[in-house]
Amino acid sequence: MLYGLKITDWDKICFVPSHNLKDGGEKTASTLKVGDKVLLKTSLGIDLAEVVSINSEESFSCETGSKQEAVILRKATKEDIRKDDYLNQKKKIKQAIKESARYVKELNLPMKIIDAHFSFDGGRVTIFFTAPERIDFRELVKALSSHFHKSIRLYQVGVRQVFELEGDIGPCGYPLCCRCFLRDFDKVSIKAAVEQNLAHRGMERLTGVCGRLKCCLLFEQNKKGNQNKDEN
């Protein structure tokens, strides 16, 4: 079996095979279910993670996540969950974002800090950010490491993913599709608009609140493509 695990909402799903459960793994595996919390050991350290899926290895898709050399140490206890909640309490996260943003401003980097997460083992802080392009943030890592006295992991989040998690109302007047039901975020090109005879509407009407081409362009294109296949 493959256990799909997420440490934070921003992280991609990490798939861990059942044989990567520590001592007593068979007993743990038989009791794990979606929604449970576990202690996960990776090359970065130890984190509290949530089981978001349980599937057979044959159903694994590299598009939804990645297999990692990680070990599920055990099912999390109430004390483990309380500890993680304490480490990542809103007040502490808000302060971490504020301090990180201050260093970003001092270094004049074109990036926006959107979230932070403290690892369960206390040795690492993950800083989540958005940016229009790739950035050399080596000086920022040094500054943050000195400030927090911990290892720093910087994680760039796509603009679409931000709106997927935070939600908003689309130009159509309905909640964003990415927030409600879309789970696969393939690249959307202007070709999708051309093939649906929508290119003449102009980029302003084809762009979503995230500033990218609307996901529904690709969704509708794929939907029509599947309908044509069924008719044939």
Question: Model-derived features: where do they sit?
Answer:
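Acidic-enriched and Gly/Ser
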Residues: 1-193, 198-200
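Iron-sulfur (Fe-S) cluster-binding segments and ferredoxin-like electron-carrier domains
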Residues: 177-196, 202-207, 213-231
